[in-house]
Amino acid sequence: MAMRGVDFKWYDGFFLSMLATSVIIVAVNWNRYRACEYPLHIWIVVDYTTVFIFRVFMFVDNGLASGLGLDFGSQQRNAMFCGRVVVLSVLSLLLYPFLWAWTVIGTQWFTKSKTCLPEEGQKWGFLIWLMFSYCGLLCIAFICVGKWLTRRQVHLLRAQQGIPISEFGILVDMIRVPDWAFEAAGQEMRGISQDAATYHPGLYLTPAQTEAVEALIQELPKFRLKAVPDDCGECLICLEEFHIGHEVRGLPCAHNFHVECIDQWLRLNVKCPRCRCSVFPDLDLSALSNLQSSGTEQHSQVNTETSEARYIRSQPQSESYFLRVQSLIHPVHTDTALETAENGGVPPVLTDLSPSRR
C-alpha cells in the first residue's frame, strides 16, 4: 500500500512485527547477555531504535513532499522545500552514516561473541537482522543513485537546448520536485506527446489557417502582473515562477502563461497546457483549409479578419476570468477589442466584419 503523504509499505509491517518480537526476547534475556564480551543487547536496541527513527523521518519527508505540487502556493512550497532540506540532511548526513558504522560494529561484536548468546535461535535471528541491515542500506544507496541518474538525464536533455546544468542543481531539483511530481510530469508530457501525434495543427496548417490562428492568439488578453496568484504561481510551459512585472497572457479557462511561451505553444497546439481545454473551441480549421494567403500585407489582414468573422461563432469572453485576475494584473494594451471583451461584449474584429470587406 502506498499513499501520497503516508507511503506505508509491506515491509513496514514486517519490520514492526520483527521489532516487537525481538524487543520482547531481548528484554526477557537481558541479564543473560551480560556474560558476552560485547554488549550485543545494547547494540540491537540502539540499532532497532535508529532504524525506527530513520523510517519515521522518511514518513515525514514523504508528507512534506506531498505539499510540493503545483496546486499549492509558492509560500507553502518554499516552506515544504526547506523542511525537506532539513529532514533529508538528517537522514543522509547523520542517520544513514551512523547505521552503516553501527552495523559494521555489530558485525564485529557478533563474530567475537556469538557463542555467548542465550539461545541458538537468537544467534540466527541476530545473523538475519545483520543481513537485513546490509541489504537495506545497499538498496537505499542504489535507489538514490538511480533517481539521481534519472534526474541527471533530464538535465542533460535540457543542456542540449542551452540551459546550464550543475550537479548541485540536480540535487536541488530532486528535493524541490519530489518523485510523485516528477512521475506525474512525465505522464503529462507523454500525454502531450500523444495528443501532438494525433492533433498537432501547427505542422499542417495552410497559410490562411496560420494567419487566422495567429490573429486569435493576439486577441487573447495580455497583462503585466502586479501580484503573483497563489493558485497559479508558475508557467507550466517553461516551469519558471511568475514574478511581479512579468508579462502573461490569459486563456479563457483562467490559466496564465508567459506571453512568449503560450504564443509558441498555441501555434503548435490550441489546447491549454494545464487543463487540456481547447483555447479556441469555435475555430473551424477545416473551413479555412481551402483559403489562400494573399501576397500583400493589406490583403492578408483583410483575409484573416474575414476568415475569423465567417468561421468563428462570436461569443463573449468569460467574465469569471477577468473577475479572478482583476486584483492581480493590469493590461499591457488597452485596445478596443480588449476593452469590449472586459465589458462582456464581443470584440469588433469578430462582429463588425461584413461580406463587403472580403
Swiss-Prot record:
Keyword Membrane included in the entry's annotation: yes
Membrane topology, from the record: Multi-pass membrane protein
GO biological process: protein ubiquitination; sugar mediated signaling pathway
Catalytic activity: S-ubiquitinyl-[E2 ubiquitin-conjugating enzyme]-L-cysteine + [acceptor protein]-L-lysine = [E2 ubiquitin-conjugating enzyme]-L-cysteine + N(6)-ubiquitinyl-[acceptor protein]-L-lysine
GO cellular component, one term: membrane
Entry EC no(s): 2.3.2.27
GO function terms (MF aspect): ubiquitin-protein transferase activity; zinc ion binding
UniProt keyword list: Membrane, Metal-binding, Signal, Transferase, Transmembrane, Transmembrane helix, Ubl conjugation pathway, Zinc, Zinc-finger
SMART domains: RING
Residue intervals of every RING-type zinc finger in the record: 235-276
Subcellular location as annotated: Membrane
Domain of life the protein comes from: Eukaryota
Knockout consequences: Resistance to high concentrations of exogenous glucose and sucrose on early seedling development.
Pathway(s) this gene product operates in, as recorded in its UniProt entry: Protein modification; protein ubiquitination
Keyword NAD: no
InterPro entries, per database record: SIS3 (IPR044793), Znf_RING (IPR001841), Znf_RING/FYVE/PHD (IPR013083)
Signal peptide: 1-27
Name assigned to this protein: E3 ubiquitin-protein ligase SIS3
Species per Swiss-Prot/TrEMBL record: Arabidopsis thaliana
Gene for this chain: SIS3
